[in-house]
């Protein structure tokens, strides 16, 4: 009888597994023609939930029967206690089976080629997250190509740490003391012999761990039913414990959770009470719907209550982004986050999961909240984000940072910025201190890439008939390929500061770092289906990366080469 019941349970589980999520397709807020109707989705969900409840009831009944039949009741009692968890897991799985392509990404087009004669200025917010790299990795590890809108090339290029020292002699001297350094180089673009690649590196000054100000952190954790699977809440719990290890006595931590309602799982407590903090993290359980708005409100209340003047005051939101009840209007949430940002409480977001993953929301509120967006797909990624790069995440050395590059038509005919599509600013926004822009954390390394068409190289766009003659004039400006301006505010400042750098036209053999990041840029562009790569193959990209791998103490570059191989294999299968 016992074996028969167990077999029945296994069959039920297999049926449920067959109903699981299918490979995600590009949604970008738009439904594909094959997407089920709302009625079909609801009917499928209800049927799956009903079957899940029946299976859960059978599991509970079997456990009760065994407790009554066998003498070792204490050991068997655990199976009875697991039955409700089984039921919640089945319901969560059923919720997502009917519409696998529900992840939401903000749609955008690649930056176009621009003529310097008409558009000499590139203006953008100087900020970068790295969440896209980990999310793309998750797709490839599942044997899937990512939706193009999930691929943000600048986040992929900037995923890799740099060994560049801010005191390096390659740094371009600044006209006044600034919280960052700059360097650049020019080299032929590997994917097009008629193009030149400009790489600009910006490195923020770092701070030693003992120099960190006191922190007032609030963990805001989604504990709704959609978070029950291993790659969601359990992964977040393990990840947060990595951050707990780094806490000091002067750091205060509170934990707020939200599902159908929100609650304080742990009132603010000193970071020295690690056992108590970890116990509160372990006690979290996933169940119910997702009232993200109410959770944010309660988290901000806790952050305000424990506010440390001159310290770090930040909310760390961990969720799959599935805000489905409460204040779920994006504009309302953005308004709340913006208001709190002005009071000194910032917000970082950590995404997990795949189906129903609302990345567009996660990225947006992190930007508005002057924080960072990260995607956690493995515990190793959590180690990188919450441990190795903790200072970059928590300590701001410059805020509202904007960059503007003016290209000299005497040297440059056309340019195309690689990445940063979602961080473009209007030209007049550069000098407007009321326009919000990105923040740079301590020790953060940012790479900018531009594909240039120099005079003498074959242009994509015909020269304007009435354009002025751009022959080299006899002036100092002929020594300048471009002019870089960076505007920023100090963390507590109200007025922006300005620093300017000349960029010369000398082309040298590319450095190892430039060759590797060019390979990474090609990888990202190819995943997006870029028209600018001239049929560059995955094997070519792999070769470029292997030849420029260099020292790789964390193994990130070796892993990247493996991802190129996966992308090549997935592409072959899909063709």
From Swiss-Prot:
SMART domains: VWA. It comes from the Bacteria. Residues 19-42 are annotated as: Disordered. It holds the Pfam family YfbK_C. Residues 216-394 form the VWFA domain. Residues 28-42 have a biased composition (Low complexity). To Synechocystis PCC 6803 sll0103. PANTHER family: STOLID, ISOFORM H (PTHR10166:SF37), VOLTAGE-DEPENDENT CALCIUM CHANNEL SUBUNIT ALPHA-2/DELTA-RELATED (PTHR10166). This is Uncharacterized protein YfbK. It comes from Escherichia coli (strain K12). The lineage of its organism: Bacteria, Pseudomonadati, Pseudomonadota, Gammaproteobacteria, Enterobacterales.
